[in-house]
């Protein structure tokens, strides 16, 4: 338990961290990865080069300082971080390394303002946060290992099937190389996949949603969008261009707190943008397999027909089941695109225009996609009277999955 004096000192640094947080985190990563180059394989080097990782850490450190009097406000964030850490293989011993370089960076960046008293306060605050994360991660590791077919760390999986879903998205069907079982998981969860990236000379992990419902015997499926450019697309490009059927990938156990609550029977509205449809398809397949008659809406946005993944599968489910309705938006409609078959609406997703279809009593809303898409849909749902606790979201990007 932190003393009132420690909490006051840490909280007093929140404005400074908001102003200088990115300088601090840039210095921190340079210092830590320079002294511990083996850790480069834990971190997304694309996000390191773009600055996204530094921005995310700066925001997290400032938020922790701001809410140090009541860190329970940040429990959802802590839960999300813990799941990602377990998928990456972060261990308790890594926290000592991070703490050493974080405290040294605070002293070096803040200069004379970083008194011994302030550094001691931040050491205590960091210790509290580290203990919280280590404890939660220990429980997640134990749960992953105890499931039938479960494991911890990296496990070799063979690509048994590689299927294009659109011009940008390809599905990889993965089976354990040891011939063993795969564990059950929750719709919406993800795995980390680790590949060697020759351009970096490093193993690099990325998180990919499991795009099929739980229960596929002996296999897991991920559906990967080819990201443009470098460094953003280094891993997805490797998967698309260099990984073929028969090749072996390192895969983590399923993790993630963005999951479907299917037990209460409430209506479900699934809203996705681009490759954000991958966890939604897992949720949709799970719900339709349950066949409990609840109302289900599948709303999807994509740029055009060429990048519309899994169209035939979604159309078939909607045609077969009267409780499932779809609303697909194309930003650009081609001359050969058929309304009601290929797409349903032209332009960007407009929930106000389809409010009679998607605003259902007591419904749960699941959102996944790029940040601007997510922000727009959250605002629209709030405008339409949907309670905040009914909205569940996963952002694809830093801190999220892809």
From Swiss-Prot:
Amino-acid positions noted as binding FAD in the UniProt annotation, renumbered to this chain: 190, 206-209, 395-398
Signal sequence, renumbered to the chain: none
Taxonomic classification: Bacteria, Pseudomonadati, Pseudomonadota, Betaproteobacteria, Burkholderiales
Keywords: Detoxification, FAD, Flavoprotein, Heme, Iron, Metal-binding, NAD, NADP, Oxidoreductase, Oxygen transport, Transport
FAD-binding FR-type domain sequence ranges: 152-261
EC assignment: 1.14.12.17
Region (Reductase): 149-402
One of the GO BP terms on file: cellular response to nitrosative stress
Cofactor binding remark: Binds 1 heme b (iron(II)-protoporphyrin IX) group per subunit.
UniProt-recorded name of the protein: Flavohemoprotein
Binding site for NADP(+): 274-279
Gene: hmp
One Pfam short name: NAD_binding_1
Binding site for heme b: 85
Domain Globin as annotated: residue spans: 1-138
Active site, UniProt feature: 95 (charge relay system), 137 (charge relay system)
UniProt-listed InterPro entries: Cbr1-like_FAD-bd_dom, FAD-bd_FR_type, FNR_nucleotide-bd, Globin, Globin-like_sf, Globin/Proto, Hmp, OxRdtase_FAD/NAD-bd
Gene Ontology molecular function terms on file: FAD binding; heme binding; metal ion binding; nitric oxide dioxygenase NAD(P)H activity; oxygen binding; oxygen carrier activity
């Amino acid at each position: 338990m932190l003393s009132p004096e420690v909490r006051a000192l840490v909280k007093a640094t929140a404005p400074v961290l908001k102003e200088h947080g990115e300088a601090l985190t840039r210095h921190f990563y340079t210092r830590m990865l320079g002294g511990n180059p083996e850790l480069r394989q834990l971190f997304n080097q694309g996000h390191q080069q773009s600055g996204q990782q530094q921005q995310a850490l700066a925001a997290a450190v400032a938020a922790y300082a701001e809410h140090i009097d009541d860190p329970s406000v940040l429990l959802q964030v802590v839960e999300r971080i813990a799941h990602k850490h377990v998928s990456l293989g972060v261990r308790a011993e890594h926290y000592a390394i991070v703490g050493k370089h974080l405290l040294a960076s605070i002293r070096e960046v803040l200069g004379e303002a970083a008194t011994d008293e302030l550094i001691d306060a931040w050491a205590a605050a960091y210790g509290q946060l580290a203990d919280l994360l280590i404890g939660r991660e220990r429980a997640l590791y134990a749960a992953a290992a105890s499931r039938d077919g479960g494991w911890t760390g990296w496990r070799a999986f063979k690509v048994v099937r590689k299927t294009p879903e659109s011009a940008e998205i390809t599905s990889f069907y993965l089976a354990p190389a040891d011939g063993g079982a795969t564990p059950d998981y929750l719709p919406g969860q993800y795995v980390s996949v680790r590949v060697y990236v020759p351009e970096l000379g490093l193993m690099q992990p990325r998180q990919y949603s499991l795009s099929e419902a739980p229960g596929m015997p002996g296999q897991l499926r991920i559906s990967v969008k080819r990201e443009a450019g470098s460094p953003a697309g280094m891993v997805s490009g490797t998967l698309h261009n260099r990984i073929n059927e028969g090749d072996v990938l390192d895969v983590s156990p399923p993790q993630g707190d963005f999951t479907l609550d299917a037990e209460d029977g409430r209506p479900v509205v699934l809203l996705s943008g681009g490759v954000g449809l991958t966890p939604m398809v897992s949720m949709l397949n799970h719900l339709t397999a349950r066949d409990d008659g609840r109302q289900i809406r599948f709303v999807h946005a994509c740029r055009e027909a060429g990048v519309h993944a899994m169209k035939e599968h979604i159309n078939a489910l909607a045609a077969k089941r009267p409780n499932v309705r779809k609303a697909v938006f194309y930003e650009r409609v081609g001359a050969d695109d058929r309304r009601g078959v290929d797409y349903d609406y032209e332009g960007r997703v407009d929930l106000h225009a389809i409010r009679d279809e998607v605003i259902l009593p007591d419904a749960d809303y699941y959102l996944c996609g790029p940040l601007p898409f997510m922000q727009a849909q959250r605002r629209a749902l709030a405008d339409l009277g949907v309670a905040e606790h009914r909205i569940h979201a996963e952002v694809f990007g830093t801190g999220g999955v892809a």
